[in-house]
Amino acid sequence: MALILNEEQQSLKDIAKEFLQKNAPVTHFREIRDTENELGYDEKLWKDMVDLGWSGILVPEEYGGFDFGMVGMGSIFEEMGKMLTPSPLFATGVLGASLITLGGSNSQKQNYLPQIVDGSITTALAVEESNRHSLSQINTQAITVSYTHLRAHETVHYL
């Protein structure tokens, strides 16, 4: 099935392609990787993405977002994939924004969604241990290792 973008979606894709080729080529990814950046991404690049409105693409307009949809966001990720762009856009702009929009209380939406849009927060997904029904039997232990690491049951997971 061919996906045909409308004019706005194509424009967003073109802007993303131009921006990422200029500001986040594959060499940028290698630099982040080789310097062992604790965040795992470039804070200035993330701020620039926020300034372009990418963090608010899936956020409803009533919370300061653009409510542009998954196809629009997908066109950005297609270009990010070509450049191997490390950023918190998926964790924040897709997972965080979607989960809060779909399952958050009105208070949570009013508090967190505008902060996702303006880039003042980033989010991460935490998964509970569904096979454990007693609080005394939970194996996951969260400790502070760095901004991007979580040690869970003797295994390091990168968020």
Question: Model-flagged regions — what are they?
Answer:
Residues 149-152, 156-159:
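Single conserved hydrophobic/aromatic residue that forms the stacking wall/gate
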Residues 40-42, 101, 133-137:
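Short, solvent-exposed polar/charged micro-motifs at secondary-structure junctions
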Residues 79-82, 99-102, 158:
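Active-site catalytic microenvironments for nucleophilic, acid-base chemistry
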Residues 66, 107-151:
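Glycine-rich, Trp-frequent "lid" loop and neighboring beta-strands that shape
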Residues 1-90, 111, 115:
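Amphipathic, small/basic residue-rich leader segments at the start of a protein or domain
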Residues 85-107:
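N-terminal glycine-rich flavin-associated loop
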Residues 19-23, 123-124, 158:
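Short alpha-helical functional segments enriched in proximate histidine and acidic residues
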